[in-house]
Amino acid sequence: VFAKEQKLVDVKPAENFYPKISTQECDSNCLLELLEARLYLSFLSEFVDQHDQFLSNIYAKLLNSITDFDKNLQKITSVKLAIIIPEKTIKSYSNTIINSSIAYLLSQRAEIKVKVFLTGTEDNHKIRSTLEQVQAQGYQYAIAALTLKGVNQLKDYSGDMKIFIPTLHKNNVSFSNLNKNIIFGSIDYDAQVLALLNKANSDIAAFSDGSMLSSNLNSRVLEQNANTRFYRVEGEKLDFYRLLRSQGSLNNASIFLNTPLIKTALISSQLRVYNIQPFVLLSTQINYNSTFLSLTQEGDRKNFILANSIDNHDDNLSYLNEIFNQSIDYNWIAYATSIGTDYFYTQFLNTKSDSLFDEKIQNSQILYKVRLMKGSKASFEELK
């Protein structure tokens, strides 16, 4: 059913695989072949912990529901999905994208072969050679976890294979005349910033930590308000007194916290310690996480608004992602990847199936709603 591979090598088709009795241990490749051949009971009997989280999660799922797992599978033949991963570039997002794709296909009982192509980096020759290999092996649909550097290698792409890029928004691409078969899936940070500014006053300030994402968010705020004051927080220690002396008071300011969750919690608590009363605290998707509720004080959250574009309604999909140790309800990369996989599956691979999502695709970009949220005692609630 699923073939997750770490090398760009050909895999024998399922119909040519025949298990043989052996006293030798079934290694990771052997276990993956058993999965591809739908020999689930053989997989369970041969499974030995390989310190492979992917295989361990599948083992747990099969162990709990082996009867239902193979029941009423969609009978689709010769259907394949490629996943292109520059693992040295996107690092931890690699597993997120692979796992969310597989979790979605499991939720649909889809009999689809998945193959992962690792490119290492996004160098021009590696992206191009991988695309050629993917197409040569007959794949018509691919999820490609590319950054802007990788997408720049697709300027001249003219193939018929449909490519979904969950990691980038189309607005970030500077060149025009992009192949219509390339679709973008990132959330829209510009739309989130605009929605948050509707809750702000004219005195805008922003905190950052110097990271690429933080700097990117700062630039988006600055585009909307040229008078924004910036406060940079680096390292583990926060010298709040020095920041205030150098940049001025934050009383009655609308403060964007373009910082990771732990620093956001620290900054919000320091505002309280220094008896600073902002007009409002604001954050984009970067801080929309269940951990936000435990790291911040309830009093600090009363005047804190977060923008969120994740709107998952499928409990089974949430459960399957949790098996892979990730949350589709808070991880926008997992959510975007799931929407892209859903698009391929329901629009092309199995048109009789229903989409699990409300989002639409327009001009080669997923359109997301922006919901403004507040953290209560134990959950997030949408502002009305």
Residue ranges and their predicted role:
Residues 2-384:
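Extracytosolic ligand-binding ectodomains
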